[in-house]
Amino acid sequence: MRARMVSAAFVMVAEAIVAGTPPMTELERQHLVAHMQMTASWLEDEVSGLSAAQASFRPSPASWTILEVLDHIVVVGPIYWKDLQSAKPVAEGRAGRMNDIDVLWYGIDRTFRETALRSEEPSRTLKDVQSGLMAYRTQHAKLLEYVRTTKDDLRSRLVERQNCDGYQWALLISTHEQRHILQIRELKAHPEYPKH
């Protein structure tokens, strides 16, 4: 009996390996929703109530202001959504070569700084933080609802842009926001950042 159970367990593991990454689990969905809610809350906390001087503080000519950081998040929202929606199902094997840990570290470690693609730079047309937050909330609600309710197997869909699966891309959207929240905190910690 024990030998049959071990054999059955071995067959199940082998089938999972052959089939590639298993579908997104409910626990993964919960983790993704929790991460998205966390970053949304942090972003709101960091930018709500800023004065115009604080939102437009630029410590150096090459730096973005807090308003530009928020603008960038708003600009990339529809682009990243489109990337997620156009993720292609893979016939077999693993979708992408990224791992979840790397995606999480992307949001935490700003040691390696990236330059935004030209199409993803701040539009510089965002007039104030409130209008930026309104646009962000709309985009975020759409993505969050999709993540909460989708029946799509995000683990078997490839987002070619990042060579990752759909779950990782949705998580990367949230960790991308987390990176920029850290950037906002760096701006606020600058010695010349306005007090009011």
Spans of model-derived segments:
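Short, helix-capping/interhelical loops that line the mouth of catalytic, cofactor-
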Residues: 16-31, 82-136, 161, 190-196
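Amphipathic, well-ordered alpha-helical segments in soluble domains
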Residues: 39-46, 76, 80, 111, ...
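Short, contiguous, pocket-lining structural segments
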Residues: 24, 31, 35-38, 61, ...
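Bacterial N-terminal signal peptides
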Residues: 4-16
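Surface-exposed, polar/charged faces of alpha-helical domains
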Residues: 34, 49-53, 64, 86, ...
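Short, contiguous alpha-helical
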Residues: 57-105, 145, 149-196
